[in-house]
């Protein structure tokens, strides 16, 4: 069984762990850089990206994650953290050749749920203060999902990033299946 690490600084950790189990993988909560050893993939969950970034710096995660050679899935704030820039001064991993529009859909009260398509399958997506891709900086970045023309899912190399919370919807497991099939099992 594959082991999927879930960065345990902030976010819906239990919900991600449940989804990982549903795709027959073992979840491992990552709280220290040493916890990264032995995992087959990493999930960077949602939360508040500036806070997560600062904590990643404090705990020594930035360089360690940048040097991982495993698939990484970023959801919501995880997408922000993987990006090259947001127009705001904040710590980023800078591993994904996109810029991000933070909170592109508005504030917490503007959060919504909507059906989108990912990998040819419909997914009930939960958008909470969700980002969007602003600019694609490399031809290696592939769009994997859109919402009314706005880019909400991309992949590049062994990195996948989405602006919504798959862990919060029943059929969000489709996202984890897609990540497992197209990234983790191919690594």
UniProtKB/Swiss-Prot annotation:
Catalysis: reaction(s): aldehydo-D-ribose 5-phosphate + D-glyceraldehyde 3-phosphate + L-glutamine = pyridoxal 5'-phosphate + L-glutamate + phosphate + 3 H2O + H(+); L-glutamine + H2O = L-glutamate + NH4(+)
Classification via SUPFAM superfamilies: Class I glutamine amidotransferase-like
Gene3D superfamilies: 3.40.50.880
Cellular component aspect of the GO annotation: cytosol; glutaminase complex
Family annotation (Pfam families): SNO
List of catalytic residues: 76, 165, 167
Domain of life: Archaea
Molecular function terms from GO: glutaminase activity; pyridoxal 5'-phosphate synthase (glutamine hydrolysing) activity
BP GO terms, sorted: glutamine catabolic process; pyridoxal phosphate biosynthetic process; pyridoxine metabolic process
Key words of the record: Glutamine amidotransferase, Hydrolase, Lyase, Pyridoxal phosphate
InterPro entries xref list: Class_I_gatase-like (IPR029062), PdxT/SNO (IPR002161), PdxT/SNO_CS (IPR021196)
Residues given in the record as L-glutamine binding sites: 47-49, 102, 128-129
Recorded family membership: Belongs to the glutaminase PdxT/SNO family.
Function: Catalyzes the hydrolysis of glutamine to glutamate and ammonia as part of the biosynthesis of pyridoxal 5'-phosphate. The resulting ammonia molecule is channeled to the active site of PdxS.
HAMAP family: PdxT
Entry protein name: Pyridoxal 5'-phosphate synthase subunit PdxT
